[in-house]
Amino acid sequence: MARGGSFSRLRLRAGVVVAAAAAALLLFAVVAPPAAALNIGLQSAGDGASKAGLCSRTCESDHCTTPPLLRYGKYCGILYSGCPGEQPCDELDACCMHHDNCVQAKNDYLSTACNEELLECLARLREGSSTFQGNKCMIDEVIDVISLVIEAAVVAGRLLHKP
């Protein structure tokens, strides 16, 4: 009985987290200026200065279970991406790179198609995947965190009728 109760509480907490994340993404989509939609280091600095420092050339693994701060590989993380032409660090990073490219092409973080493709890619990795040398994160935890955020984005995209 206690096990069922704790499972119900866990499902309720997960539902609240997904709802809160969807609300945050919805708010972000409404109030964020278009330039903040995807930061891949291509925006003009206005004074001729290079903004290459805003994209990643290093395989990172920081804040593994904290969605807003997560940095994994070169491409996984909110408003975080690899520099143009950078190779992904591993298969998970390749999923994130593909998602970043899709979102960039559609200019829409809430693209249901891009987000569902990322979820499918993440599901394939759950069956087993290697990681890059020096990784400090547990890859399954990173997949769980990214999945939670992207599931919220799918909900928000559907609410806003984003293709």
Swiss-Prot record:
Its main location: secreted. It comes from the Eukaryota. Disulfide bonds join 55-83, 59-89, 64-137, 76-96, 95-121, 102-114. Residues 1-43 form the signal peptide. It is found in: Secreted. Its EC number is 3.1.1.4. Binds 1 Ca(2+) ion per subunit. One of its GO terms (molecular function) is lipid binding. Keywords: Calcium, Disulfide bond, Hydrolase, Lipid degradation, Lipid metabolism, Metal-binding, Secreted, Signal. PROSITE patterns: PA2_HIS (PS00118). The keyword Calcium applies. It is an enzyme of class 3 (hydrolase). GO terms for biological process: arachidonate secretion; lipid catabolic process; phospholipid metabolic process. Its cofactor is Ca(2+). GO terms for cellular component: extracellular region. The active site is at residue 99. It catalyses: a 1,2-diacyl-sn-glycero-3-phosphocholine + H2O = a 1-acyl-sn-glycero-3-phosphocholine + a fatty acid + H(+). Ca(2+) binds at residues 75, 77, 80, 100. InterPro entries: PLipase_A2_dom_sf, PLipase_A2_His_AS. CDD domains: PLA2_plant (cd04706). Inhibited by EGTA. Belongs to the phospholipase A2 family. PA2 catalyzes the calcium-dependent hydrolysis of the 2-acyl groups in 3-sn-phosphoglycerides. Releases lysophospholipids (LPLs) and free fatty acids (FFAs) from membrane phospholipids in response to hormones and other external stimuli. This is Phospholipase A2 homolog 3. It comes from Oryza sativa subsp. japonica (Rice). The gene is PLA2-III.
